[in-house]
Swiss-Prot record:
Domain of life: Archaea
Annotated function: Involved in the regulation of the intracellular balance of NAD and NADP, and is a key enzyme in the biosynthesis of NADP. Catalyzes specifically the phosphorylation on 2'-hydroxyl of the adenosine moiety of NAD to yield NADP.
Gene Ontology CC terms, in alphabetical order: cytoplasm
HAMAP family documented for this protein: NAD_kinase (MF_00361)
Cofactor entry: a divalent metal cation
Binding site for NAD(+): 67-68, 72, 137-138, 148, 165, 167, 178-183, 202, 237
Active site, per annotation: D67 (proton acceptor)
Example of a GO biological process term: NAD metabolic process
Keywords assigned: ATP-binding, Cytoplasm, Kinase, NAD, NADP, Nucleotide-binding, Transferase
Swiss-Prot/TrEMBL catalytic activity: NAD(+) + ATP = ADP + NADP(+) + H(+)
Matching NCBIfam families: PRK03708.1
InterPro entries linked: ATP-NAD_kinase_N (IPR017438), ATP-NAD_kinase_PpnK-typ_C (IPR017437), NAD/diacylglycerol_kinase_sf (IPR016064), NADK (IPR002504)
Gene: nadK
Protein name: NAD kinase
Length: 278
């Protein structure tokens, strides 16, 4: 078994724990690689074991950080590599264990005492081309001018679903339903469901409400106000300005995100984290 280790770059405790994980796995006889950014912020790792995330070819990536660190790993890795998330963030919806459980969790992984949790992702096409990363959480179409609304139409499988004047439109996976989409009034969606949430962001019309559609749906978003640019955000990690006439299409990605899990229960973990957030 070969491991990758990635740490949150702005937290010394995460970097130090990453080195302890690295050392533990090396001493246990496993091949271990570390991503370049982790090494850049803590140079104690062997330089021979340092690789860009894009070149990781391992069995499991141990990510020490929060959801943002996991999303960064997801966007940069080329393969569907299972992730073991150790929470060094705020809430850590995507992480599996707390720091004090790290080495017990690693021992269970080594013994094969775990299962893989697969999550759907969204793929975005801009004028028919896939030029942006797949989204684990959400794709957001946002106003390009703060304080100015945008006028959008969105279609489900070719049929007009709604026309909204709002700050934006969020298209979310079940995984992302506890994030930006929930802040926009969207529902909590059990991550085991195969659906997509569409949530207008601060719409003018009270009739513009969140929708839940099958993940097999094709979602087309069109900018009605052709004089106003929009911003496309993917998981809050990738941003790009789009010209007003850009045709945006969102579908379920053929790729999935895989997580190492030790417990098959969703509740009460998710609901407790949602409540602690507010």
């Amino acid at each position: 078994m070969k491991f990758g280790v990635v740490a949150r770059r702005d937290k010394l405790e995460a970097l130090k724990l990453a080195y302890r994980v690295y050392d533990f796995l090396k001493v246990s006889g496993f091949d271990v690689v570390v991503d370049e950014d982790t090494y850049r912020y803590l140079g104690e790792f062997s330089e021979d074991d340092v690789l860009p995330l894009e070149e990781f070819d391992v069995d499991i990536i141990v990510v020490i950080g929060g959801d943002g660190t996991i999303l960064r790993v997801e966007h940069k890795t080329k393969k569907e590599i299972p992730i073991l998330g150790i929470n060094m963030g705020t809430l850590g919806f995507l992480t599996e264990v707390e720091p004090h459980e790290t080495f017990f969790a690693l021992s269970r992984v080594i013994e094969g005492d775990y299962h893989i949790d697969e999550r759907i992702k969204l793929r975005t096409f801009l004028d028919g081309e896939n030029r942006v990363p797949d989204a684990l959480n959400e794709v957001a179409v946002l106003t390009g001018i703060p304080g100015k609304i945008i006028h959008l139409k969105y279609y489900i499988d070719g049929g007009l679903a709604d026309e909204v004047r709002a700050d934006g439109l969020i298209i979310s996976t079940p995984t992302g339903s506890t994030g930006y989409a929930m802040s926009a009034g969207g529902p909590f969606v059990d991550p085991r469901l195969d659906v997509v949430v569409i949530a207008p962001l601060a719409p003018i019309a009270l009739s513009s409400r969140p929708m839940v559609v099958p993940s097999s749906s094709r979602i087309d978003v069109r900018n009605v106000a052709m004089t106003r640019e929009v911003i496309l955000s993917v998981d809050g990690q990738f941003y790009t300005y789009l010209s007003p006439e850009t045709e945006i299409t969102i579908v379920r990605s053929p790729r999935k995100t895989k997580f190492v899990r030790f417990n098959r229960e969703i509740y009460p973990k998710y609901t407790m984290k949602i409540k602690s957030r507010f």
